[in-house]
Amino acid sequence: MTWQGWAEIALTLSLAVAIGWPLGVFLSRVWNGEKTFLDPVMRPVEGLFYKACGVDPSKSQSWHAYALALLAFNLIGFVFVYAVLRLQGVLPLNPQGFPGLSGHLAFNTAISFITNTNWQSYAGETTMSTLSQMLVLTVQNFVSAATGATVAAALARAFVANRGEGVGNFWADLVRTTLYLLLPLAFVVAVVLAALGLPQTLAAGVTAHTLEGAEQKISLYAVASQEAIKMLGINGGGIFNANSAHPFENPTPLTNLITAISINTLGWAAFFAFGRTVLAKKDVRALVIAAFVLLFAGAVGVYATETQAPPAQVAAQVDTSANMEGKEVRFGAPATAAWVAMTTGASNGSVNGKHSSLMPLGGGIAMFLMQLGEILPGGIGSGVAIMVVMALLSVFVAGLMVGRTPEYLGKKVEAREIQFSILAVVIIPLSMLGFSGIAAVLPEALKGLMHSGPHGLSEILYAYVSGTANNGSAFAGLTANAPWWNVTLGIAMAMGRFMPIVAVLAIAGSLVTKPKLAPTAGTLPTDGGLFIGLLIGVILILGGLQFFPAMALGPIVEHFQALDAVAALR
């Protein structure tokens, strides 16, 4: 570990928060329908969408109607993506001549992209046509991110309302977030990335002649445009199998910095937008501090583990100062550690190194950050929504200790809110532990494992927590393109996406009808250090403690096995 490495990690994480603040102010204006500098261009386009679809953007929906519209939109998206992927072989813009995907792979991929997970059981450069990449995958990168933002917007309005009825209009929130925030920002970042060397072409590829005289086909796509929204939308699915470790997706340390910051920027922006919308900037600042502390601790932990020489190399007396297996030398350990924390703390899942090659404890930290609920800062809107759920549970615990009905942001927190809050946070352990337990003993599932023992179990655990948390990263030792893995991971992704969303919207529907209360002497302050500590404690207990037995059999056992193996060689 070096001071330069610490500085690089601190700078990368801090820049994402700093850039997220002004974008959050802008996003709140978009949610609230306030005037923005993009109005002269985007207002007419926005109006065309409403007119074509017969939508009245001023009509507020109940939480039931809002949730139904959200689910219907995503169901239509699933059917469309599935159909295009299955028919890929007969559709145009397929210069590579790729056939359509199998039924189970198309099912998995369609759910993966509509849920903002971007889990990939395939290698993009050898599976997806140009049309598939552009028409369905890139489009879903935009609208799946916007879908998450709509949930936070609805929840924010519920806290502001005083005995209200509706939580907003889903269609208006979706269109405005896409047109005013995601499209312009992605355009700017795409131009910057293209200028820095990322390919942007509709050509299938080029042919290169190697030093041995052989011909090599190098795949090309419109990489820069998809890379921009892949990061900004906190999606993570790469065009190339190596993802952001591939030089066409991430060629230089500068592109690495830009894309790493992009992973978290709009997640933090949603926090600040929520705070401005609910008129509680100090309270939401406490949420940001809690999330940043946990994220920074995760990055520090990964950096500490990855700058220790692997035990086997120590035993072999190999001179090494870091574990460089699975890492790009153009980035090094600090940039990889920062990326690991940022991509697993958010629901991004892109990688600039191989997570399966991390030291056992480093891989365990990556898993742990996902187990916390993807709230550091999580997806656009979905992260702050689940963080607010954690805050509701925190004030509930505090209320139990002092014997008072808890309040948060001027609303009483009662049984209905706590019931739906528990539903929102129980999905990850239910899916991860349930599916992992079955897969660990099912021969059909075990065929996909490259490794046995603790690392094999870690591959299973990582896959299901990544799918359920809508992250999408993986331990590469798992061969996931098989019916069992594609179907069960698809179910896990759908559970992890839509069950918490419906629970949060139900909370919003309950809160919106309640009166707005002024704070009293008995109200727990939710903007100070005491609450931040309580919140972090609740997150660690709910998000981490329940997974400890399973983690003890995976990365923790693997760590001690490595130490024992080295001791035996000495």
UniProtKB/Swiss-Prot annotation:
PANTHER family: POTASSIUM-TRANSPORTING ATPASE A CHAIN, POTASSIUM-TRANSPORTING ATPASE POTASSIUM-BINDING SUBUNIT. It is a multi-pass membrane protein. This is Potassium-transporting ATPase potassium-binding subunit. Pfam families: KdpA. Belongs to the KdpA family. The gene is kdpA. NCBIfam families: kdpA. It is found in: Cell inner membrane. InterPro entries: KdpA. GO terms for cellular component: plasma membrane. Keywords: Cell inner membrane, Cell membrane, Ion transport, Membrane, Potassium, Potassium transport, Transmembrane, Transmembrane helix, Transport. Part of the high-affinity ATP-driven potassium transport (or Kdp) system, which catalyzes the hydrolysis of ATP coupled with the electrogenic transport of potassium into the cytoplasm. This subunit binds the periplasmic potassium ions and delivers the ions to the membrane domain of KdpB through an intramembrane tunnel.
